[in-house]
């Protein structure tokens, strides 16, 4: 990757660990000043100190906290909206999250982190990006946003929402020079995937990818600068743009 981020300001949510921490380190290595945001203050501050960035406590599901974070920073060049959770029902393995046992609180938790967090984040950073006529908003979706996930249907719901949001917002933001994109990793080796789930995936021959591969995809999306693009990351296969259907703004060929 040859992209140079010198002098740019990048925000990473969920930056205390896993994919977020890896991308924060990658941005810093490429020259960016990185703002790490998370609920985990200890690990988040450690990552920020390691890369010479800054740390901010942030509940991505809280619109007021978004305003307090983004307001004083001026325009950002990159926002990586990465924070997310799975359903995680008590007394059930991660491979069995029955809908009938999901409480209202559990539902609001996952929707707040995975959907509200992306919408509130984009809403907070977009105006100043539009004002400057440039910027990148990269969202972490999942392969679960491109297909069916029978063991956690609500997680799949949230990631389908992220994919649709990134594609649709790209049609608007792209006319102002701002690129939105979604990254769809397969199962990544992070704390969101339990040891039990990793063992099950390995036994089934499903690849578990490294956070570094996801960081590669984020940089690929930024370099490509294609508004509304969706990028698939699966095993060792090349990182590719995923586009199963013609975009809404293109006319279908006549029959």
Where are these regions (language model features)?
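C-terminal helical subdomain
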Residues: 182, 198-244
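A short, exposed helix-loop element centered on a Lys and neighboring polar residues
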Residues: 122-123, 167
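Conserved glycine-rich cofactor-binding loop
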Residues: 16-17
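Catalytic Tyr-X3-Lys loop
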Residues: 85, 98-119, 134, 138, ...
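Conserved NAD(P)H cofactor-binding loop of Rossmann-fold oxidoreductase domains
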Residues: 82-95
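Active-site-adjacent segment of SDR/Rossmann-fold oxidoreductases
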Residues: 30, 147, 168-178
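The beta1-alpha1 cofactor-binding region of Rossmann-like NAD(H)/NADP(H)-dependent oxidoreductases
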Residues: 41-42, 57-68, 104
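Residue(s) in the substrate-gating loop at a strand-loop-helix junction
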Residues: 142
């Amino acid at each position: 990757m040859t992209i140079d981020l010198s002098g740019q300001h990048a925000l990473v949510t969920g930056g205390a660990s896993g994919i977020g921490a890896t991308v924060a380190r990658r941005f810093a290595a490429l020259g960016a000043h990185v703002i790490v945001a998370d609920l985990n203050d200890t690990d988040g501050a450690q990552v920020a100190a390691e890369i010479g960035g800054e740390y901010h406590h942030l509940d991505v599901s809280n619109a007021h906290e978004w305003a307090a974070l983004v307001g004083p920073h001026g325009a950002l060049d990159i926002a990586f909206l990465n924070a997310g959770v799975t359903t995680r029902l008590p007394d059930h393995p991660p491979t069995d999250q029955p809908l009938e046992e999901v409480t209202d609180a559990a539902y609001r938790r996952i929707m707040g982190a995975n959907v509200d967090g992306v919408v509130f984040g984009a809403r907070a950073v977009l105006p100043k990006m539009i004002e400057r006529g440039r910027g990148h908003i990269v969202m972490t979706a999942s392969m679960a946003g491109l297909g069916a996930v029978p063991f956690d249907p609500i997680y799949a719901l949230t990631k389908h929402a992220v994919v649709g949001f990134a594609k649709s917002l790209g049609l608007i933001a792209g006319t102002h020079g701002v690129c939105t994109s979604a990254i769809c990793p397969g199962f990544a080796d992070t704390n969101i995937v339990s040891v039990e789930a990793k063992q099950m995936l390995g036994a089934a021959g499903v690849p578990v990818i490294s956070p570094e591969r996801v960081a590669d995809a984020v940089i690929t999306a930024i370099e490509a600068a294609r508004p509304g693009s969706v990028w698939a990351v699966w095993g060792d296969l090349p990182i590719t743009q995923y586009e199963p259907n013609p975009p809404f703004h293109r006319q279908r060929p006549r029959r």
